[in-house]
Amino acid sequence: LASLKEVTGNIVIRNSYNGADLTGLDNIVSAGGLQVGSTDVASKATELHMISMKALETLSGDISVYNDQVTYVLFEKLATIEGSVMFNASSLQSFEFPVLTTVGQDLNLQGLNEENTAAGSIASLEIPELTSVGGALSVNNLAKLTSMSFLKLKETGGLDFHTVPVMLETINLPEIETVNGSIIMEANMEAPPTGSFVPQRNDVLQAFGGMDKLTTIKGQIKIKNFTALKQLPDWSKITTLGSITLDYLEDVSGTLLLPNARFETFGETAPQIEIINKVQLSKIE
């Protein structure tokens, strides 16, 4: 395989594969896709700990990895993925795409284990050059995650962070302008600490990094279970929006400013502002 530079179809890693990494594929520059396991049956390649293709620059299809043993993910030169990215890796420690700029469809990173609970030990997630995701950007069920940064992301089909860990401290999206779907940021609820009857929510994230360049959200904004959040982002540039739901944001107060927002119906999202539990906003303008 050492001389192989291009694969037009999918590279499929079978259960019988017993390597620790994908060293034999290190000279491939372009491929149709990469598949390790599936949504129906996770990969049983029990020795596979590293997913990496050192020379790979473009994929015309998808990356899909479903494997409980994969610990490290590194694609040093991969800049464009025309299809989707799906990783469900409950042992994940590191996830690196240092030059990736474009994903044509969904980018979905999960850490569900066999018990269907959040797992993985990755603490920090950053895709530094990512500017566009055609589908939804989803990061969920990573139990130890404390920081997420997408510093150049400008447009995506949605932001789906619906299982944010209670200890997540940072979500950075300083350049995001257009979301052609919904923004869901919801922290987990965990069992009450000893001596308390109140479920534990995220009590460390105090502010979102950025989101003040947002102009278009073709769906809802939902922010829930961030009890230490001091203020909402500056949404004064938003011109198009479906709805807003705010819930269990105990430290948020003051005025919700949406001076330029025009509410529209997108699919099943009806135009509304919904303030539910423990939000201390005094007025909406």
Q: Could you tell me what each predicted segment is?
A:
Residues V7-Y72, K77-Q93, V99, G104-S124, ...:
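Concave beta-strand-loop units of leucine-rich repeat
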